[in-house]
Amino acid sequence: MTLTKETRVTLNDGNMMPILGLGTYAAPDVPKSLAEEAVKTAIDVGYRHIDCAFITGNEMHIGNGIRSKISDGTVKREDIFYTGKLWCTYFSPDMVRKGLERSLRDVGMDYLDLFLMHWPVSLKPSGASDPSDKDKPFIYDNVDLCATWEALEARKDAGLVRSLGVSNFNRRQLERILNKPGLKYKPVCNQVECHVYLNQNKLHSYCKSKDIVLVTYSVLGSHRDRNWVDLSLPVLLDDPILNKIAAKYNRTSAEVAMRFILQKGIVVLAKSFTPARIKQNLGVFEFELKPEDMKTLESLDRNLHYGPFREVKQHPEYPFHDEY
Protein backbone atom coordinates (compact mmCIF):
# COMPACT_ATOMS: atom_id res chain seq x y z
CA MET A 1 0.00 0.00 0.00
CA THR A 2 1.29 3.44 -0.92
CA LEU A 3 1.57 5.62 2.16
CA THR A 4 0.66 9.32 2.08
CA LYS A 5 0.07 11.96 4.72
CA GLU A 6 -3.66 11.31 4.22
CA THR A 7 -3.34 7.57 4.98
CA ARG A 8 -5.31 6.43 8.02
CA VAL A 9 -5.54 3.08 9.76
CA THR A 10 -8.91 1.67 10.78
CA LEU A 11 -9.14 1.02 14.52
CA ASN A 12 -11.05 -1.94 15.96
CA ASP A 13 -13.97 0.35 16.86
CA GLY A 14 -14.27 1.66 13.29
CA ASN A 15 -12.65 5.04 13.88
CA MET A 16 -9.72 6.16 11.71
CA MET A 17 -6.26 7.25 12.88
CA PRO A 18 -3.73 9.08 10.65
CA ILE A 19 -0.52 7.07 10.37
CA LEU A 20 1.69 10.09 11.09
CA GLY A 21 1.11 12.37 14.03
CA LEU A 22 2.80 15.28 15.76
CA GLY A 23 4.26 14.49 19.17
CA THR A 24 4.15 17.46 21.53
CA TYR A 25 6.28 16.53 24.55
CA ALA A 26 8.70 19.26 25.60
CA ALA A 27 11.21 19.50 28.43
CA PRO A 28 10.13 21.81 31.29
CA ASP A 29 12.54 24.56 30.19
CA VAL A 30 11.02 24.79 26.69
CA PRO A 31 8.58 27.73 26.37
CA LYS A 32 5.01 26.41 26.19
CA SER A 33 4.23 28.87 23.40
CA LEU A 34 6.44 26.83 21.06
CA ALA A 35 3.95 23.97 21.27
CA GLU A 36 1.15 26.21 20.05
CA GLU A 37 3.18 27.43 17.09
CA ALA A 38 4.31 23.87 16.26
CA VAL A 39 0.70 22.71 16.10
CA LYS A 40 -0.24 25.59 13.80
CA THR A 41 2.68 24.80 11.50
CA ALA A 42 1.89 21.08 11.50
CA ILE A 43 -1.76 21.62 10.57
CA ASP A 44 -0.77 24.10 7.85
CA VAL A 45 1.52 21.54 6.16
CA GLY A 46 -0.93 18.66 6.42
CA TYR A 47 -0.73 16.91 9.80
CA ARG A 48 -4.13 15.90 11.16
CA HIS A 49 -3.03 13.74 14.11
CA ILE A 50 -1.93 15.60 17.26
CA ASP A 51 -0.73 13.67 20.31
CA CYS A 52 -0.52 15.23 23.76
CA ALA A 53 -0.77 14.31 27.45
CA PHE A 54 -1.81 15.90 30.72
CA ILE A 55 1.62 15.32 32.25
CA THR A 56 3.37 17.46 29.60
CA GLY A 57 1.58 20.53 30.94
CA ASN A 58 0.95 22.07 27.52
CA GLU A 59 -2.55 20.88 26.59
CA MET A 60 -3.86 24.43 26.84
CA HIS A 61 -1.30 25.64 24.29
CA ILE A 62 -1.92 22.66 22.01
CA GLY A 63 -5.63 23.41 22.15
CA ASN A 64 -5.01 27.07 21.32
CA GLY A 65 -3.08 26.01 18.23
CA ILE A 66 -5.80 23.64 17.05
CA ARG A 67 -8.62 26.09 17.66
CA SER A 68 -6.81 28.87 15.81
CA LYS A 69 -6.58 26.68 12.70
CA ILE A 70 -10.26 25.80 13.03
CA SER A 71 -11.14 29.48 13.40
CA ASP A 72 -9.21 30.51 10.28
CA GLY A 73 -10.88 27.78 8.22
CA THR A 74 -7.81 25.60 7.64
CA VAL A 75 -9.51 22.58 9.23
CA LYS A 76 -12.73 21.53 10.91
CA ARG A 77 -12.75 19.85 14.32
CA GLU A 78 -13.70 16.53 12.71
CA ASP A 79 -10.55 16.69 10.53
CA ILE A 80 -8.32 16.54 13.61
CA PHE A 81 -7.47 13.33 15.48
CA TYR A 82 -6.48 14.41 18.98
CA THR A 83 -5.03 12.05 21.57
CA GLY A 84 -4.95 12.77 25.30
CA LYS A 85 -3.71 10.60 28.17
CA LEU A 86 -4.90 9.82 31.67
CA TRP A 87 -2.00 10.28 34.08
CA CYS A 88 -1.25 7.63 36.71
CA THR A 89 -2.49 9.75 39.65
CA TYR A 90 -6.01 9.67 38.15
CA PHE A 91 -6.38 5.87 37.89
CA SER A 92 -8.75 5.46 40.82
CA PRO A 93 -12.19 4.94 39.20
CA ASP A 94 -13.63 7.93 41.03
CA MET A 95 -10.83 10.13 39.63
CA VAL A 96 -11.01 9.08 35.96
CA ARG A 97 -13.77 11.51 35.06
CA LYS A 98 -11.91 14.36 36.78
CA GLY A 99 -8.73 13.56 34.85
CA LEU A 100 -10.54 13.46 31.52
CA GLU A 101 -12.55 16.61 32.17
CA ARG A 102 -9.39 18.49 33.09
CA SER A 103 -7.85 17.56 29.74
CA LEU A 104 -11.04 18.50 27.90
CA ARG A 105 -11.09 21.85 29.66
CA ASP A 106 -7.41 22.57 29.06
CA VAL A 107 -7.48 21.66 25.38
CA GLY A 108 -10.86 23.34 24.88
CA MET A 109 -12.70 20.43 23.25
CA ASP A 110 -16.06 18.74 23.75
CA TYR A 111 -14.56 15.30 23.14
CA LEU A 112 -11.21 13.59 22.58
CA ASP A 113 -10.68 11.32 19.60
CA LEU A 114 -8.52 8.99 21.68
CA PHE A 115 -7.81 8.75 25.41
CA LEU A 116 -5.07 6.49 26.75
CA MET A 117 -4.01 5.10 30.10
CA HIS A 118 -0.54 6.66 30.02
CA TRP A 119 1.36 3.97 31.97
CA PRO A 120 0.08 0.80 33.65
CA VAL A 121 1.29 1.99 37.07
CA SER A 122 -1.13 3.69 39.45
CA LEU A 123 0.25 6.45 41.68
CA LYS A 124 -1.24 8.29 44.64
CA PRO A 125 -1.76 12.02 43.99
CA SER A 126 -0.16 12.86 47.33
CA GLY A 127 3.24 11.84 45.93
CA ALA A 128 5.36 12.97 43.00
CA SER A 129 3.69 13.28 39.61
CA ASP A 130 6.70 12.83 37.32
CA PRO A 131 10.52 12.49 37.48
CA SER A 132 11.06 16.26 37.43
CA ASP A 133 9.28 16.54 40.79
CA LYS A 134 12.31 16.24 43.08
CA ASP A 135 10.64 17.48 46.27
CA LYS A 136 8.68 14.32 47.09
CA PRO A 137 8.80 10.61 46.28
CA PHE A 138 6.44 8.61 44.11
CA ILE A 139 3.80 6.87 46.21
CA TYR A 140 2.59 3.65 44.63
CA ASP A 141 -1.10 2.85 44.50
CA ASN A 142 -2.66 -0.54 43.81
CA VAL A 143 -5.61 0.35 41.58
CA ASP A 144 -6.79 -2.56 39.42
CA LEU A 145 -6.13 -1.64 35.78
CA CYS A 146 -9.45 -3.23 34.84
CA ALA A 147 -11.29 -0.95 37.26
CA THR A 148 -9.71 2.08 35.61
CA TRP A 149 -10.67 0.68 32.21
CA GLU A 150 -14.31 0.26 33.26
CA ALA A 151 -14.40 3.90 34.34
CA LEU A 152 -12.97 4.89 30.96
CA GLU A 153 -15.62 2.84 29.17
CA ALA A 154 -18.26 4.88 30.99
CA ARG A 155 -16.66 8.09 29.68
CA LYS A 156 -16.83 6.71 26.14
CA ASP A 157 -20.50 5.87 26.66
CA ALA A 158 -21.02 9.46 27.80
CA GLY A 159 -19.63 10.73 24.48
CA LEU A 160 -16.55 12.42 25.92
CA VAL A 161 -14.15 10.06 24.14
CA ARG A 162 -14.40 8.44 20.70
CA SER A 163 -11.78 5.71 21.20
CA LEU A 164 -9.94 4.20 24.17
CA GLY A 165 -6.41 2.83 24.29
CA VAL A 166 -3.38 2.22 26.46
CA SER A 167 0.26 3.22 26.50
CA ASN A 168 3.37 1.37 27.71
CA PHE A 169 1.44 -1.83 28.46
CA ASN A 170 3.10 -5.22 28.09
CA ARG A 171 1.39 -8.33 26.71
CA ARG A 172 0.30 -9.60 30.11
CA GLN A 173 -1.34 -6.30 31.00
CA LEU A 174 -3.11 -6.11 27.65
CA GLU A 175 -4.42 -9.63 28.16
CA ARG A 176 -5.90 -8.67 31.52
CA ILE A 177 -7.92 -5.93 29.86
CA LEU A 178 -8.93 -8.13 26.92
CA ASN A 179 -10.00 -10.99 29.23
CA LYS A 180 -11.90 -8.75 31.64
CA PRO A 181 -15.43 -10.11 32.27
CA GLY A 182 -17.99 -7.76 30.74
CA LEU A 183 -15.47 -5.93 28.55
CA LYS A 184 -17.33 -3.38 26.43
CA TYR A 185 -14.50 -1.85 24.40
CA LYS A 186 -11.13 -3.30 23.46
CA PRO A 187 -8.14 -0.99 23.53
CA VAL A 188 -7.76 0.32 19.98
CA CYS A 189 -4.02 0.87 20.35
CA ASN A 190 -0.96 0.50 22.54
CA GLN A 191 1.35 3.51 22.35
CA VAL A 192 4.93 2.53 23.16
CA GLU A 193 8.52 3.56 22.65
CA CYS A 194 9.65 2.03 19.35
CA HIS A 195 12.56 2.81 17.04
CA VAL A 196 15.49 1.27 15.21
CA TYR A 197 17.15 0.30 18.53
CA LEU A 198 13.86 -1.03 19.99
CA ASN A 199 11.83 -2.60 17.19
CA GLN A 200 9.14 -4.16 19.44
CA ASN A 201 8.58 -7.03 16.97
CA LYS A 202 7.09 -9.45 19.50
CA LEU A 203 4.74 -6.90 21.03
CA HIS A 204 3.77 -5.69 17.55
CA SER A 205 2.97 -9.23 16.44
CA TYR A 206 0.83 -9.82 19.52
CA CYS A 207 -1.05 -6.53 19.10
CA LYS A 208 -1.74 -7.31 15.43
CA SER A 209 -3.19 -10.67 16.44
CA LYS A 210 -5.66 -8.86 18.70
CA ASP A 211 -6.49 -6.08 16.19
CA ILE A 212 -4.72 -3.50 18.36
CA VAL A 213 -2.71 -0.84 16.52
CA LEU A 214 0.83 -0.19 17.71
CA VAL A 215 1.65 3.53 17.93
CA THR A 216 5.20 4.68 18.54
CA TYR A 217 6.72 7.62 20.38
CA SER A 218 10.46 8.38 20.54
CA VAL A 219 10.82 7.09 16.98
CA LEU A 220 13.96 9.22 16.60
CA GLY A 221 15.53 7.87 19.76
CA SER A 222 13.93 10.25 22.25
CA HIS A 223 14.54 13.78 23.45
CA ARG A 224 17.52 14.42 25.71
CA ASP A 225 15.60 15.51 28.80
CA ARG A 226 17.66 14.27 31.75
CA ASN A 227 14.49 13.94 33.85
CA TRP A 228 13.40 11.02 31.67
CA VAL A 229 16.42 9.88 29.66
CA ASP A 230 19.86 8.49 30.52
CA LEU A 231 22.08 10.90 28.59
CA SER A 232 24.90 8.34 28.43
CA LEU A 233 22.88 6.25 25.95
CA PRO A 234 23.92 6.40 22.28
CA VAL A 235 22.23 8.96 20.03
CA LEU A 236 20.15 6.95 17.57
CA LEU A 237 20.35 9.45 14.72
CA ASP A 238 24.17 9.29 14.86
CA ASP A 239 24.18 5.56 14.08
CA PRO A 240 26.63 5.02 11.17
CA ILE A 241 24.58 2.29 9.48
CA LEU A 242 21.40 4.35 9.69
CA ASN A 243 23.25 7.32 8.21
CA LYS A 244 24.74 5.18 5.43
CA ILE A 245 21.26 4.06 4.40
CA ALA A 246 20.00 7.64 4.62
CA ALA A 247 22.77 8.78 2.26
CA LYS A 248 21.80 6.02 -0.18
CA TYR A 249 18.30 7.50 -0.46
CA ASN A 250 19.48 11.12 -0.18
CA ARG A 251 17.38 11.46 2.97
CA THR A 252 18.04 12.44 6.58
CA SER A 253 18.62 9.77 9.20
CA ALA A 254 15.39 10.96 10.85
CA GLU A 255 13.37 10.37 7.69
CA VAL A 256 14.78 6.85 7.32
CA ALA A 257 14.19 6.06 11.01
CA MET A 258 10.53 7.09 10.67
CA ARG A 259 10.02 5.39 7.31
CA PHE A 260 11.37 2.13 8.76
CA ILE A 261 8.69 2.14 11.46
CA LEU A 262 5.90 3.20 9.07
CA GLN A 263 6.74 0.36 6.67
CA LYS A 264 6.37 -2.07 9.55
CA GLY A 265 2.74 -0.97 9.82
CA ILE A 266 3.20 1.07 12.99
CA VAL A 267 1.73 4.55 13.49
CA VAL A 268 4.45 7.16 14.02
CA LEU A 269 4.42 10.21 16.29
CA ALA A 270 7.18 12.62 15.26
CA LYS A 271 8.07 15.20 17.90
CA SER A 272 9.42 18.51 16.69
CA PHE A 273 8.82 22.18 17.45
CA THR A 274 11.03 23.35 14.58
CA PRO A 275 8.93 24.47 11.57
CA ALA A 276 11.46 23.28 8.98
CA ARG A 277 11.71 19.82 10.57
CA ILE A 278 7.95 19.48 10.96
CA LYS A 279 7.64 20.01 7.22
CA GLN A 280 10.72 17.92 6.39
CA ASN A 281 9.32 14.93 8.29
CA LEU A 282 6.58 14.65 5.66
CA GLY A 283 9.37 13.52 3.34
CA VAL A 284 8.82 10.02 4.73
CA PHE A 285 6.05 9.67 2.14
CA GLU A 286 8.35 10.45 -0.80
CA PHE A 287 10.42 7.25 -0.77
CA GLU A 288 10.26 3.57 0.17
CA LEU A 289 12.95 1.48 1.81
CA LYS A 290 14.01 -1.64 -0.07
CA PRO A 291 13.61 -5.04 1.66
CA GLU A 292 17.36 -5.42 2.14
CA ASP A 293 17.57 -2.06 3.90
CA MET A 294 14.59 -2.90 6.09
CA LYS A 295 16.41 -6.12 7.05
CA THR A 296 19.59 -4.21 7.87
CA LEU A 297 17.70 -1.76 10.06
CA GLU A 298 15.95 -4.65 11.83
CA SER A 299 19.38 -6.02 12.74
CA LEU A 300 20.22 -2.85 14.69
CA ASP A 301 17.75 -3.71 17.47
CA ARG A 302 19.31 -3.47 20.96
CA ASN A 303 16.12 -3.70 23.05
CA LEU A 304 17.10 -0.23 24.25
CA HIS A 305 14.58 1.88 26.15
CA TYR A 306 15.47 5.57 26.22
CA GLY A 307 12.59 6.32 28.57
CA PRO A 308 12.12 3.34 30.92
CA PHE A 309 10.58 5.41 33.78
CA ARG A 310 12.96 3.76 36.26
CA GLU A 311 11.54 5.78 39.15
CA VAL A 312 8.62 3.32 39.29
CA LYS A 313 10.67 0.18 38.65
CA GLN A 314 9.60 -1.37 41.96
CA HIS A 315 5.90 -0.90 41.19
CA PRO A 316 4.17 -4.31 40.85
CA GLU A 317 2.77 -3.20 37.48
CA TYR A 318 6.08 -1.93 36.06
CA PRO A 319 5.80 -3.14 32.44
CA PHE A 320 9.39 -3.77 31.42
CA HIS A 321 10.21 -6.69 33.70
CA ASP A 322 8.44 -8.89 31.14
CA GLU A 323 10.09 -9.73 27.82
CA TYR A 324 7.33 -7.82 25.98
Swiss-Prot record:
Cross-referenced SUPFAM superfamilies: NAD(P)-linked oxidoreductase (SSF51430)
UniProt cross-references to InterPro entries, sorted A to Z: AKR (IPR020471), AKR1C (IPR044482), Aldo/ket_reductase_CS (IPR018170), NADP_OxRdtase_dom (IPR023210), NADP_OxRdtase_dom_sf (IPR036812)
GO MF annotation: an example: oxidoreductase activity
Residues found modified as N-acetylthreonine: T2
Pfam families: Aldo_ket_red
UniProt keyword list: Acetylation, Eye lens protein
Residues the record lists as binding NADP(+): 218-281
Annotated family: Belongs to the aldo/keto reductase family.
Subunit structure: Monomer.
Stored PANTHER family: ALDO/KETO REDUCTASE
Protein name: Rho crystallin
